[in-house]
Amino acid sequence: MGEKIKNLPEELRPRERLLRHGPESLNPAELLAVLLGSGTPQENALELALRLLTTFGGLKGLIEVHPEQLKSFKGIGQAKAAKLLAALELARRYYELTGENKLNFLNPDDVYNYLRYKIGHKKQEQVVVLYLNTKNQLCGENIVAIGGVNHAGVSPGDIFREAVKIGAYAVIIAHNHPSGDPTPSKEDIDFTGRVKKASEILGIKLLDHIILGENKYISMKAERLF
């Protein structure tokens, strides 16, 4: 049975150290322990945090973990899982907010850098549409499918419905490949071709279809695949 954190010397307690010296003084396990708040009868919060990080392969693995895996992890439960998921989502939204101040999508790198923290790590394919104004600035975005373009029933209508509603000038499609390989599949190419035809009919430009892999991406526009 692990020693309770409250019985540790004050200089070893993560919460007290955070308040006294700032969050940058804590390692990932200690920061995680502060979020957890408490442990189990068998282990304290710090030991539980270390087990979480070890099991899921560090911070990167923890960010990528499916919510159901987290909720079913021994010692976590619904309340602790909710705290962790909320903290991870706040971090993602921070990246969104800081990125939106600079978001003129002038090249594929801009799209990749914006979306890599949103969908690049997901274990399931997610199809995202970015809606742009005439200056190529973000005016909206939408996740139109989870599961991928080849088996989630995504249609060109799903891509352009919101674009028409908000008066978008152009759209960029993006989706991730959980395998880490961003090479477009035949389904990706066929789907993009259908969307391109619909864009010409509607008068809304399709600027690109970006496929995100593990720390890399492919621009279907740059590859002249549509």
UniProtKB/Swiss-Prot annotation:
Keywords: Hydrolase, Metal-binding, Metalloprotease, Protease, Zinc. Zn(2+) binds at H175, H177, D188. One of its GO terms (biological process) is proteolysis. A motif (JAMM motif) lies at residues 175-188. Gene3D superfamilies: 5' to 3' exonuclease, C-terminal subdomain, Cytidine Deaminase, domain 2. GO terms for molecular function: metal ion binding; metallopeptidase activity. Residues 104-226 form the MPN domain. InterPro entries: MPN (IPR037518), RadC_JAB (IPR025657), RuvA_2-like (IPR010994), UPF0758 (IPR001405), UPF0758_CS (IPR020891), UPF0758_N (IPR046778). NCBIfam families: PRK00024.1, radc. Belongs to the UPF0758 family. This is UPF0758 protein CHY_0341. It comes from Carboxydothermus hydrogenoformans (strain ATCC BAA-161 / DSM 6008 / Z-2901).
